[in-house]
Design a protein with these regions (language model features):
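ATP-dependent phospho-/nucleotidyl transfer catalytic cores
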Residues: 128-216, 246-249, 256-259, 263, ...
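C-lobe/activation-segment region of protein kinase-like
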Residues: 236-343
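A generic secondary-structure signal for well-formed alpha-helical elements
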Residues: 62, 108-112, 217, 273, ...
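Catalytic-loop of the protein kinase fold
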Residues: 215-225, 230
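Amphipathic alpha-helical segments that form well-ordered structural scaffolds
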Residues: 97, 102-110, 179, 205-212, ...
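Activation segment
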Residues: 60, 128, 178, 231, ...
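Conserved ATP-binding subdomain of kinase catalytic cores across diverse folds
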Residues: 30-171
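Regulatory N- and C-terminal appendages and interdomain linkers associated
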Residues: 1-53, 59-70, 281, 300-353
Length: 353
C-alpha cells in the first residue's frame, strides 16, 4: 500500500473510531473476529467501514489505572531490570500497558511525519471495561513464574494484578496480515533465487529498522520474526510490550540498563536471523544449530545454505555464538546473567557490519 493510501485509510478509520462511545466501541470489539491470545493480551480483527483493523486488548491493571499512574511510563511495579528480556524460558510479566501505548504513539507519529514507514499505524486507543482473564499459559503457574523471575514480591504483585485486571487498554492498529516468519518461509520454498533475494533484503531491512529505532532512543527488546510484519515491500516492527526508551520515566538503575543495551536489538535480530536460516535450511534443532554456527565462527562454510544465507551466517556467526551463550545462561542459569557488552564491542570492532 502506498503512503497516500495508508494515510487516507488511517484518517477514515481513526475518525470513525473516535466518534464511537465507550459502549459502542466495547460492543464492536466484542463482535470482532478473535485471532488469538498470549502473554501480551488478546487480538481480534475488526471491520471499520470496509477497512480491516487489528485490535489488541492489553490487560490494564488496577494499579496502572490509579490517577497518579495513568499514562505513566515509570516502572510502576518496581520489577527488576532483567524482566525486560523476552528470551526467558518462561514468559516475563511485562512492564505495563502505558509503555506500549507510548511506543505506539511514538512510532505512529514517525510514520505520519514521514520520518519512517516501518511501523503499523495506531488508528485509535481506548480504555475499555473487561472481564478478568485467565493468566496466559506462561504465567498460569504463578509460583513457578515468580520463582523463575527472581522470587521478588514485585513480580508476584504484577502477575496477580494481571489476573485481576478488570479493564484493557484497547489498541486499534493498521492490519498487516503476514509476519516475517511466514513470509520468509514462503520465499525460501520458492527456490534459491527467491531465497537469496529475500535473505539479502531482510538482512538490510532489519538493520535499517533497528538502527532507526535505536537512534531515536527506542529499544524494541523483542524483535523476533513473529513480532515483525511484512507486505514483501517493507518490514513493520510491532508488539512493543517489552520496548524501552530513554524518554520513559526511568530510575537511575534502569537508565543505566538502557545505556548498556544500546546494541541489544541489533545483536538480537542478527542472532535470530542466523538461527532462523540454519533451522530453515538444515532442519536443525538448537544443539546442532549452535554447533554449526560455532564451526562457521571458526571459518567453516555452511554448504547446505544458498549463497546469500551462507554469507549472512558466515558474517554474523561470531556474534551469534556470543548471544546464544548469553541467552542460554539467562534462560537456564541466572536471570542476572550480565549482558556481554564488552565481547560484543570487540566482535563489532573486528568485523564491522
Amino acid at each position: 500500500m502506498s503512503r497516500r493510501a495508508r494515510l487516507a485509510a488511517h484518517s477514515a478509520v481513526s475518525t470513525s473510531l473516535a466518534m464511537c462511545s465507550d459502549d459502542t466501541l466495547h460492543d464492536l470489539v466484542g463482535a470482532a473476529v478473535p485471532l488469538g491470545s498470549g502473554i501480551g493480551g488478546r487480538s481480534a480483527l475488526l471491520d471499520v467501514d470496509g477497512t480491516p483493523v487489528f485490535v489488541k486488548r492489553v490487560p490494564l491493571t488496577d494499579l496502572e489505572r490509579l490517577p497518579e499512574n495513568v499514562r505513566s511510563t515509570a516502572n510502576i511495579f518496581g520489577l527488576p531490570d532483567f524482566c525486560q528480556y523476552g528470551v526467558g524460558e518462561i514468559g516475563g510479566p511485562g512492564h505495563g500497558a502505558w509503555r506500549e501505548l507510548a511506543v505506539h504513539t511514538m512510532t505512529t507519529n514517525w510514520v505520519l511525519a514521514n520520518e519512517d514507514q516501518q511501523f503499523p499505524l495506531m488508528h485509535h486507543w481506548r480504555v475499555l471495561p473487561d472481564t478478568a482473564q485467565s493468566l496466559p499459559e506462561e504465567l498460569a503457574d504463578v509460583e513457578r513464574a515468580v520463582t523463575y523471575w527472581g522470587g521478588g514480591p514485585e513480580v508476584r504483585r504484577r502477575i496477580e494484578a494481571l489476573e485481576q485486571a478488570s479493564a484493557s487498554l484497547t489498541l486499534f492498529l493498521e492490519y498487516i496480515p503476514q509476519n516475517l516468519h511466514e513470509w520468509l518461509g514462503e520465499e525460501i520454498k520458492a527456490g534459491d533465487e527467491a531465497a537469496n533475494r529475500a535473505c539479502s533484503w531482510v538482512e538490510r531491512a532489519l538493520h535499517a529498522g533497528t538502527s532507526f529505532m535505536n537512534a531515536r532512543a527506542l529499544l524494541h527488546f523483542d524483535a523476533h520474526f513473529e513480532n515483525i510484519l511484512t507486505d514483501g515491500r517493507r518490514l513493520y516492527f510491532t508488539d512493543y510490550g517489552l520496548a524501552l526508551s530513554s524518554r520513559f520515566d526511568l530510575s537511575p538503575e534502569h537508565a543505566r540498563f538502557f545505556e548498556r543495551h544500546q546494541t541489544y536489538d541489533r545483536c538480537y535480530t542478527v542472532w535470530y536471523l542466523v538461527s532462523w536460516l540454519v533451522t530453515a535450511f538444515c532442519g536443525y534443532g538448537r544443539e546442532d544449530r549452535e554447533a554449526l554456527v560455532g564451526e562457521c565462527a571458526r571459518g567453516a562454510r555452511p554448504a547446505e545454505l544458498p549463497a546469500a544465507a551462507q554469507a549472512i551466517v558466515m558474517r554474523y556467526a561470531p556474534l551469534t555464538v556470543v548471544i546464544s551463550d548469553f541467552i542460554r545462561k539467562l534462560r537456564h542459569e541466572s536471570r542476572q546473567t550480565p549482558y556481554p557488552l564488552e565481547e560484543i564491542r570487540r566482535i563489532i570492532a573486528s568485523k564491522p557490519g
